[in-house]
């Protein structure tokens, strides 16, 4: 399986570790490279809650570095200022959730160059912007760990499958804290079948990207919609005149979105689901 997926992504099998979803991947990284009750981790926020959650479980101090408020861009100086003597890991999500934007590569490289610990780039949504992957940086930085998920672009959320990609010595350290047989045969078989049909996955991703454009255009016509941030993921981050009221209204209509910092994270679904969302907002 490592050879098959690695062939698609141009990654040697020795640089790959498979595990049961993003939550386990983050947990393994923390257990491998940070000591509980002593070390800390930094994350650029707003971002996924999994980093804070696993830090708490592993008794690690969780430190936040704010993305630039105007456009949620990564700023290396802010991240490095959040780092302390106990910081072993920096977590960056690109495309970022919930904001949807890719993080600036130049800023990322500055962090990789100046931070002594490991930088984890979570590319769980990278299938929606494959040209932006930082995989090639593995040849340059031994302190880079890349996290990939099969939940979004691969549409296998129920399978709970993820991959960690890093320098072989890093993978060996992760293997020492992981289970002897981390992923079951049934899961590997299901994933292998999807990997063999990569063209179908690419078709699905293109459909989501097309739908994202349509939803964005429809939202921009609404008077209540004040700002739609650029997205390279399978969702949009939208600011409404009263986002809290819109959130409550949609919930009553049976439509679930995620409220974050005065905005709503809206997942792009099937065409009929997107039409239902826009239809409900137009009636408000």
Per-region residue spans from a language model:
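Phosphate-binding glycine-rich loop
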Residues: 2-41, 58
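Short beta-strand
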Residues: 147, 227-231, 257-259
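Conserved PLP-anchoring active-site segment centered on the Schiff-base-forming lysine
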Residues: 32-54, 68
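PLP-dependent aminotransferase class I/II
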Residues: 143-221, 228
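Conserved PLP-binding catalytic core of the aspartate aminotransferase-like
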Residues: 208-209, 219-253, 264, 268
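Short beta->alpha connector loops at strand-helix junctions that form conserved
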Residues: 45, 64-69, 123, 261
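PLP-dependent enzyme catalytic core of the Aspartate aminotransferase-like
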Residues: 106, 244, 249-258, 262-284
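Active-site phosphate-binding strand-loop segment of PLP-dependent enzymes
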Residues: 69-123, 127
